[in-house]
């Protein structure tokens, strides 16, 4: 197995896709949120690498090509937004106010918890962009002096938790309005949460896609201000 990773240019991509396929099959079979395809693919990939004694750099030689698709995939989320453009125009003020509140709440939460836990400045800024898409958040973390690799892990945890528990939270707080649900998913758990929003409905998916873009821009602007709080 180790030789396969060293000699094959696309070994990393192959393992990643097969792992995700396994996750998708388990999700369809058991229909439980815990069987999130991304979460399952991470676990399977790590297990294979550990058992095969393959280091990350060797794996990433082939897997890095998937990273190139990250930004184009994020841009494609504009399609459902375009399809719901009229709905957005009629609710523009409420949408923007809700997203602004969501971003500020996210940043304040990170600040308060970092203070309580006594985190360093580097740890604090590492988690500031936790709720925005990876394509934007990695740049924010690097610019502020955070640990980018840890930021990516925080993105994944935030997204998976939103994907798994987001719908349950909406039920608990009796959030039934499609626009509100979509904005909540997108602003709190970026693209991974948006995948769940798209499953729920077309309007939810479109609003979640909008939330990714707007929340990303607002976070880029406000995170520089919040970075000086610690």
Outline where the language-model segments fall.
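Short alpha-helical transmembrane interface motifs in multi-pass membrane proteins
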Residues: 7-8, 59-60, 93-95, 121-122, ...
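Small-residue-rich segments of transmembrane alpha-helices in multi-pass membrane proteins
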Residues: 39-51, 71-76, 97-109, 128-138, ...
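Transmembrane alpha-helices that form the ion-translocation and gating core
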Residues: 97-135, 158-175
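Juxtamembrane boundary at the C-terminal end of a transmembrane helix
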Residues: 115, 221-230
